[in-house]
């Protein structure tokens, strides 16, 4: 009953904000036990103390840990002489040396150590009997120094333990002397024991399996977490953490955190089978919740039932808990213990801020070897985390790895989900596999990836992590519009900084077998929000990486590796250039194919389709300038998606008809043609030669990897494809940078009216200055967005008009087509689709003016050729070979 009253008093005190220092048994910093010595060392120390009692200096007794730092004892020399102790001692006589040597031999035999070397001591002293006493003393001392190394090493170790213990006592005394407002309030709550509902938890003798420890954290800067005296229970138990996993969450439901923790618990069980049953002590999980008011009620209820959270206190928690998994009503199965740190932030700061706490506060204290990033809702397979860690253990040059992210239970009747399923599969099969061969993966997804902590950790404030968190440590005005957009894809910045780290040669790797299933946006509005953020951030991050290519000269990569990186980044530059004109290429594809089909048969329908298409593009520009994608604008986005999808499927059908249909081979101008689809049929011969194998590249690559499910989502992907290439996604701005302010209570006057008024005036002046600065920054971002959209629209229009009225298309397109064939060795999703669109535009334009093209392509097909499968890395490379006209 007294414990319950004590607990209630503590909870009430913490809620009122005036928590008193914890009781001695639950104090923040408990004095460490004195070092334990070996029994023989203890016996030797006792004898030495008794024999040298009058000659050794005495030390002042150690003060208690609750004293101030100035009260920490200092060893003082009480002997009033400037000479050393050895010089003050008389020289022993030879007979006494012999007696001392015999004593050493007997002592050595008693502690069961080899005494062969000690048997030489009496003999050496007998030989020196006729010599002077100092010579005998010197000989004996030399033998003692050379023969007692084992005992000396043990004594040295004991001395180191003693020094560590004294430093700990001094640190505890310093922390105990902190002002009352800085003392750490910590409370143990039997939530874990209550979660077992009367059953005895495993390892119930340890407090970490019975009690949850709550700590109210007042640190504003996460890097000062350890310096302010906060200690995680895992660190207090002196456990060396090898794998540190973070789960970032916002407002997800309890079922999502349940799935993620269950997947990690299964993975921990598998790692315990591989590394040993006690490996769970080297694994810890940190759950960082972004905002107390944003946390889901069902998620908090689940954590409360698990024993990782208590509704009464909103703090950072640290515990060790066994995760039960009830399989049926007759028995229960228990996973290995999972050490969980649940951090609930008071304010919403974003996912990047959650990573800031994980790396700069928790990881900096625990110093793990590997860190794993997981989003809540992502469910790793049983062996996924193990495979990520094993790949870095086998190759010490790998600094980061990424697994395969798959859609959890894709709904093929929902085109939004099915299109993302197809895109994820193709990206994993083609993009990441090939980038892994080069050693640089453009982005390691934050939903499921792992880093070697040594590779990204900052050294004296310099390293990948400070650049990764630059958008949090800098104001929006300091970043500017370019960097503000660039840090929408901070994952890409971290990968580039890891690759180009000075005097290092870190690489990245893709692990195909490490699969994690995640939930994807299910509505069109959510998909557009995600696409805007990803496309915008990747575009500006790509420009940043290309512009800072010279920093590779400071890394320690080999010359051949740097040449490969240069080639890869040159390709990325070309990809960014082509993606700039992606919208105009899509329009030209629709324009030429529809013109070939409907110029003579239905000119009014053709004019209406093209006019409506341009009107939709103009509407998207207006929405991009003024409104965010919200449910109120969902109807317009839905209409544009459906219309562009229908146009895409129509163009695809016309292209397939041109491949399999029968018709004349005559080439005529579509403006004077008679008969629908006549000109399209004229392309049959050239299209069938190149487009058929090109169409099978994606499917053949998928079949090599055993991904047969893409057949069920390919139609939905082509239907949604125009939605992914809306250039209005550019210049979205920044992701919550304007809301990054300092939190905490504000100070007021001491109670006098005059002081209160002055304080309020200062606060009002600060608010006005901050509001004016924010308005100026917003205006600069709006101007940047409007200017960029205007430039993009002008470039798209200019390219479309030039290609429509061009009569020398061989000069314009035959040169780039050779470059396309060269760079098509590297298969990329965005570039491949763009090249397909541009190739069909060239095919249609050449058919109108000059006849069949030299290298025709289809709008719905991607370049192909020989397929080279590298089984070691599971990378598929599409090699495109030009086909010359007969």
From Swiss-Prot:
Its EC number is 2.4.1.16. The chain crosses the membrane at residues 534-554, 578-598, 605-625, 636-656, 672-692, 695-715. Signal peptide: none annotated. Its main location: membrane. Residues 16-37 are annotated as: Disordered. Keywords: Cell membrane, Cell wall biogenesis/degradation, Glycosyltransferase, Membrane, Transferase, Transmembrane, Transmembrane helix. This is Chitin synthase. One of its GO terms (biological process) is chitin biosynthetic process. It comes from the Eukaryota. InterPro entries: Chitin_synth (IPR004835), Chitin_synth_fun (IPR004834), Chitin_synth_N (IPR013616), Nucleotide-diphossugar_trans (IPR029044). Belongs to the chitin synthase family. Plays a major role in cell wall biogenesis. It is a multi-pass membrane protein. The keyword Kinase does not apply. It catalyses: [(1->4)-N-acetyl-beta-D-glucosaminyl](n) + UDP-N-acetyl-alpha-D-glucosamine = [(1->4)-N-acetyl-beta-D-glucosaminyl](n+1) + UDP + H(+). It is an enzyme of class 2 (transferase). SUPFAM superfamilies: Nucleotide-diphospho-sugar transferases. GO terms for molecular function: chitin synthase activity.
